[in-house]
């Protein structure tokens, strides 16, 4: 299969959630998020006003992903309104925050992860349907955003698996060989 055929097959299997990265500055974090989003077959990765990122950190997975670069918070919020996105912002220190284990992670969530220093933009926090915090037990201030994004995607998938739903689709069985693709 060539790359376009692989991407088309992946598109058939994708999950409906999206990942948005708000003004991230660490190029390795962005690449790692893209690689992890690929592992969970996210529909799309939205980069909001981010700095250039290292493709090497994505281990080539960016070639198979839908990555939209949005120049600003305003442009992202306009896109979110037009598309009817269900924004779930991940932020440690926000009013009315809900813990990851108790929050609502809908099928079509757009999970937003913020800048390493300043977190998610206050305007995005205000527009979010929910603000979620990932429990921390040590004295560290926060998780790296790539780790937080991975934990959130894993929790999204775990909930579907707990409901008895197939989280990682298996290839269709080949009628001639009787095995998966």
Model-derived segments and spans:
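Post-transcriptional modification and biogenesis factors for structured RNAs
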Residues: 1-181
């Amino acid at each position: 299969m060539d790359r376009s055929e692989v991407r088309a097959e992946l598109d058939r299997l994708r999950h409906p959630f999206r990942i948005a990265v708000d003004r991230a500055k660490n190029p390795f974090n962005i690449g790692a998020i893209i690689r992890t989003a690929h592992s969970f077959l996210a529909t799309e990765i939205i980069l909001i006003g981010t700095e250039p990122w290292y493709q090497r950190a994505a281990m080539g997975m960016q070639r198979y992903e839908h990555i939209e670069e949005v120049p600003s918070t305003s442009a992202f919020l306009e896109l979110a309104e037009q598309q009817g996105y269900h924004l779930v912002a991940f932020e440690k220190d926000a009013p009315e925050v809900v813990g990851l284990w108790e929050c609502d992670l809908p099928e079509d969530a757009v999970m937003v992860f913020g800048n390493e220093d300043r977190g998610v933009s206050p305007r995005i926090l205000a527009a979010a349907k929910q603000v979620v915090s990932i429990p921390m037990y040590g004295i560290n201030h926060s998780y790296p955003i790539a780790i937080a994004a991975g934990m959130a995607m894993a929790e999204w998938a775990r909930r579907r698996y707990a409901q008895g739903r197939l989280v990682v689709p298996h290839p269709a069985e080949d009628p001639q060989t009787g095995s998966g693709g």
